[in-house]
């Protein structure tokens, strides 16, 4: 208004003052049609109250009951006087504020990388390894916060925040199984891969039934050998794997704010794993096991940070309407792994990117560590083709890790093809901006 530009206001009769020459319009926030972090922020109803996300969690802090008043000169009959100056005034906007841990530059880089990587259904999340702060989280598809009704009939679940939702994860869970083995002194375990193996009468194949030959833990991670991890799982036993998974945070929800809670996922029970075939499936992240992208990122933080992680958090501080600020910090790290296991796994996952099937994730100017995954879902399209969740999760730089990044795509081809290049683009963008 101060720029002299025309503004169209949609008002109802209840919003017109009883004083005939004053028009009162409530002050509402309005988001751009391409708002970053839309699933985190949420959207408002027609009265300006938050319905989802941060807007709902902190509605009592963010809602404004202020109004803009337009005084319009009128004659004795209530008709506006042509050419008269309109006087615009507004009430003091009495609202608080919520400061998130999101870094806008990183968030924008993630949003762009997802779209550039053609991830139409999926997500990406970036976590600061030092303290667990969520620096970026983007989900696809998005919805328009100003025209929510346009997306209500969509079959692709545009309102679902995939960063906090659980999915079949596949081979990226091999990182947790490898951690369980290292914690128990099995880093020297080897086996012969012939492209497939039979356990409990069920045949499990490696990708394209490739025979990897004699494989140790480092090589098994590089080529993502199912046969190796199936045999390793049988040697470890179900309890060892589930105990390590629990230490890394799998099967546990995380509350970021009131109503913003990540799904706990599903860790199979001891009863569900009491057959060799069920344990074999679990050993490479298949079967009933599910986890959220934020849980995968949390696991990678532990690997990168000497075996410790801080639970991911999203809200840095809240200032209420009286001006009182409350800050939130992560001061209590969880010790999940030994420093020695962390060091060895970091070296192995760096080799996955340098020499293995994660090479398409390699950043331009520094090293990274990570793991691919292509997870079967048991869901088929109309042509009978199984839809897979594809993943890449990693951290960088390998020698002094700062960020953990996880990308997931629904209906993808492979983690190496779909998600690893997106990781590389995000890592390069963050390095350039800093």
Question: Each PLM stretch: what is its role?
Answer:
Residues 1-95, 407:
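Small/polar-residue-rich segments within soluble enzyme cores
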Residues 36-39, 94-98, 120-123, 193, ...:
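Envelope-exposed proteins and targeting segments
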Residues 55-75, 117-137, 241:
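Carboxylate/His-rich catalytic cores and anion/metal-binding grooves
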Residues 82-122, 130:
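Conserved, well-ordered alpha-helix/loop/beta-strand core segments that scaffold catalytic motifs
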Residues 85-86, 128-171, 176-411:
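Beta-lactam-recognizing serine transpeptidase/beta-lactamase-like catalytic domain environment
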Residues 108, 413-414:
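Short beta-strands and strand-coil junctions in structured, solvent-facing domains, enriched
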Residues 296, 415-424:
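Short, charged, low-complexity patches
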Residues 325-330, 421-434:
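Short, gly/Ser/Thr-rich active-site loops of penicillin-recognizing serine hydrolases
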